[in-house]
Amino acid sequence: MLQPKRTKYRKPFLVRHDKRKAHKGNTVEFGEFGLQAVTSAWVDARQIEAARIAITRRMGREGNVIIRIFPHFSKTSKPIGVRMGSGKGSPEKWYTAVKVNTVMFEVSGVSEEIARDALRLGGHKLPVSWKIITKSEGDNQ
């Protein structure tokens, strides 16, 4: 699973994610087809990994998958049954904030039918609404 090698602070303050549109990372740059977010949400490292596995299994041995999002923020939690107080909990999961129009995954080297089907399967693993775009569609947004 994806997580940072090092962070400046292990436990961040409350991180708020912006629900506005993404102005960077909103076009297909490296592949031919992309999975673009239509809504904003927090995406967990496990969800990113589940989507990546679903996409690569559908594509078989052909083509490339490019992951365009990375979980930078840690989410802390305390164990169940622990009383209030005595400090902040330990980091449990890693998240990223996905804005509207962010391209999350890109696919290249496969036919359009396989690429659309693979991205559809991967999109169902994510907590955001999405659409599939091509490299030419991303230019005119």
From Swiss-Prot:
Task: Return one Gene Ontology term, BP aspect.
Answer: translation
Q: Which Pfam families match?
A: Ribosomal_L16
PROSITE patterns reported in the protein's UniProt record: RIBOSOMAL_L16_2 (PS00701)
Q: Which SUPFAM superfamilies match?
A: Ribosomal protein L16p/L10e (SSF54686)
* Gene Ontology molecular function, alphabetical: rRNA binding; structural constituent of ribosome; tRNA binding
* Keyword Nucleotide-binding assigned: no
Keyword terms of this UniProt record: Ribonucleoprotein, Ribosomal protein, RNA-binding, rRNA-binding, tRNA-binding
Q: Name one GO cellular component term.
A: cytosolic large ribosomal subunit
Which top-rank group of organisms is this from? Bacteria
Question: What does the subunit comment say?
Answer: Part of the 50S ribosomal subunit.
Q: Give the PANTHER family listed for this entry.
A: 50S/60S RIBOSOMAL PROTEIN L16 (PTHR12220), LARGE RIBOSOMAL SUBUNIT PROTEIN UL16M (PTHR12220:SF13)
Biological role stated in the UniProt entry: Binds 23S rRNA and is also seen to make contacts with the A and possibly P site tRNAs.
Instruction: Give the UniProt family note.
Output: Belongs to the universal ribosomal protein uL16 family.
Q: What is this protein called?
A: Large ribosomal subunit protein uL16
Question: What organism, scientifically named, is this protein from?
Answer: Mycoplasmopsis agalactiae (strain NCTC 10123 / CIP 59.7 / PG2)
Give the gene that encodes this protein.
rplP
